[in-house]
């Protein structure tokens, strides 16, 4: 009996705990999209190790065709050394793609963040701190800095102003670490929000619940990972954290995301 139970437990662990990187793809259609574009999104690496020069991760990245790369925060961890994060940035630089980065809450906790940011920029990465960039004539990316360490009322007032000043004729993309301001409704005029932070709710049970716990959302979070369409579209990545996490990821493989933007009239 003991052998049977032990075997069943071992089988469960082998099936449920996997750190093989998943590529999750989404297609977003809008009449405001003026050119087809593939966006690669990575979030929540937390300076974790995917082999020498992040080979396991880079093999996945190189297997997809993308036009631009977005990094959604917590790429550099506040506890682990930044070496593995910098290895990733160095490898991304060699791809020759434009790379944009927003801070997450763990980067905002780093005491020498100015030095870390300088190193990030040396890899050709553009950090967006409540700043915007056009990815095409009509596709605008707005990178929003994380709220950690900020006075919350002032921060949310800035978000309201940013939201009010959007040009609705553009296809507006919000790159922000936490998805909280999607359901808090501070940012409600975008066409697409791309976030991470949740680590996929840590534990999942497919077809039953999508995550057990997430910071900012508590137990059984609605926005733990996937695509959502309430007022507009939200994509939440389950991210790449592994050895940094206190508990193992169960039925919750680390992931990167390929987001295809297409004009609705071309489909």
Mark where each language-model region is:
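N-terminal membrane-anchoring alpha-helices
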Residues: 1-34
């Amino acid at each position: 009996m003991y052998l049977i139970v032990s075997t069943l437990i071992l089988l469960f662990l082998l099936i449920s705990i996997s750190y093989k990187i998943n590529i999750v793809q989404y297609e977003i259609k809008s009449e405001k999209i003026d050119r087809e574009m593939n966006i690669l999104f990575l979030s929540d690496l937390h300076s974790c190790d995917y082999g020498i020069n992040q080979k396991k991760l880079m093999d996945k990245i190189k297997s997809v065709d993308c036009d631009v790369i977005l990094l959604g925060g917590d790429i550099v961890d506040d506890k682990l050394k930044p070496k593995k994060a910098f290895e990733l940035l160095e490898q991304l630089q060699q791809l020759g793609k434009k790379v944009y980065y927003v801070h997450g809450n763990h980067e905002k906790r780093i005491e020498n963040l100015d030095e870390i940011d300088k190193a990030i920029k040396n890899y050709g990465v553009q950090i967006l701190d409540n700043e915007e960039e056009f990815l095409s004539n009509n596709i605008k990316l707005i990178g929003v800095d994380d709220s950690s360490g900020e006075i919350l009322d002032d921060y949310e007032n800035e978000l309201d102003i940013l939201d009010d000043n959007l040009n609705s004729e553009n296809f507006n993309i919000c790159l922000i670490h936490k998805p909280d301001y999607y359901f808090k409704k501070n940012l409600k005029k975008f066409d697409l929000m791309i976030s991470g932070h949740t680590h996929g709710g840590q534990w999942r049970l497919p077809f039953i619940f999508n995550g057990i716990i997430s910071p900012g959302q508590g137990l059984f979070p609605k926005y733990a990972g996937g695509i959502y369409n309430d007022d507009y579209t939200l994509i939440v990545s389950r991210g790449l954290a592994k050895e940094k996490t206190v508990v193992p990821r169960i039925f919750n493989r680390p992931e990167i995301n390929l987001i295809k933007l297409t004009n609705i009239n071309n489909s």
